[in-house]
Amino acid sequence: MKEFDLESYDYYLPKELIANYPVLPKEKAKLLVYERRSQTITHTTFEHVLDFFPKNALIVLNDTKVMKARLFGSKHAFLPSKTTEVFFHRFFKDNTALTQIKGKIKVGDKIFFDENYYAEVLELLHNGQRLIAFYDNQTPLNQENILKLLEQYGHMPLPPYIKRADESLDAHEYQSVFAKHTGAVAAPTASLHFSQHGLEKLLKDFKHAFLTLHVGAGTFLGVETKDIREHQIHTEVLRIPKKSQEILQKSQEILCIGTTALRSVEYFKRLENPNQEAFECDIFLHLANPILHVNYLLTNFHLPKSSLLMLVSAMIGLEKTKEIYKIAIEKKYRFYSYGDGMLIL
C-alpha cells in the first residue's frame, strides 16, 4: 500500500525555501491553518495563532533546553587548530556520554578542548556512536561540570540543512522562551514561534501543561526502510511531572505545541497506570499506528521521508499532507526548523 511506501513521502523543495535564519519579530512568521472538519485552509501569521486555538483545549508544551552540543577540539594538546568535532548526544552511566565524533577515532584517543579540558574515547559502538568521558587535568568531570564545559566551549547544534556556522543569535533564537531543562540536541521547533509576550498570553488564556522530551540527534535521521512500518525510531528521554500527568489524564481536548509534545502525550496516554515521572520514549506515529489522544497540532513543515512528515500524515492523511505541502511551496512558506508553521485543527 502506498501509504506505507517510503517513496510516497518524498517531495521536491526548492532550496530557497529552506529557512537559514528565523523571522524576527517571531509573530511575523507565516502560519497555515488547516481545519479538518470544513476542509478549509487559512493563510495568516503567528500574530493571530492564539485566535485559532480551541478555547477548551489543553495546550501541551515541551520545555526542554538545547545544549551547546557541538564541541571542536584537537587530537594533540599542543595543536592550536581545532578540527575534530564532537557532537554530544546524551549522558550515559557513571558520567560518561554518548557522542558522534567526525573522522577516524580509536579507543584511547584524546580530544583536547584547551590546555586543561579533554575527552577520552572509551568505546566505539556499533551504531556509530562513541562512548567518551570528560576530564579536567585527569580529573573526571561529573554531569554538572560537563554541562558547564558545553556551555563554555560548545556551539549550538544547528540542523545539517542549515548551511552556515552558528552565530550569536542562535544561542537565543534556536531556543524556546520557555526552555527550562537542559538536555536536547535539537530544538522543538514549533515552540520557537512564541515570543515572551505570546507565551504569557497563552499561559493566561488557556489551560496548559509542561513536559520535557529531550530531543535527540535521531530527529534528523530519515526513514530508510522501504516499508515505513519496519523503521526503528530512536529513543529519547521523557519526563512528565505528576502535576502534568494529572492534567493530561483529565483532559478531553489536547493541542500540542510541536511533534515532540505530541509524541510524548501519545506515549504517556498509552501506558497502563504509569507510576513514575521518567520514561524512555520511542513511539513512531504513522498511518498504521495512528494518533489516538491528541486533537490538534501546531508544527513546522518537515523534511521529505522523515518520521515527522509521517506523523502529520497520520493526523490528516497522506494525500491531504501532500496537497497542503504543495500549497505551502507555491505560497513560498519557509520550511524546517527556522521556518513558518502549520496549525492542524
From Swiss-Prot:
InterPro entries found in the cross-reference section: QueA (IPR003699), QueA_dom1 (IPR042118), QueA_dom2 (IPR042119), QueA_sf (IPR036100)
Example GO biological process: tRNA wobble guanine modification
GO MF term set: S-adenosylmethionine:tRNA ribosyltransferase-isomerase activity
PANTHER family: S-ADENOSYLMETHIONINE:TRNA RIBOSYLTRANSFERASE-ISOMERASE
HAMAP family the UniProt entry points to: QueA (MF_00113)
Oligomeric and partner information: Monomer.
Protein name: S-adenosylmethionine:tRNA ribosyltransferase-isomerase
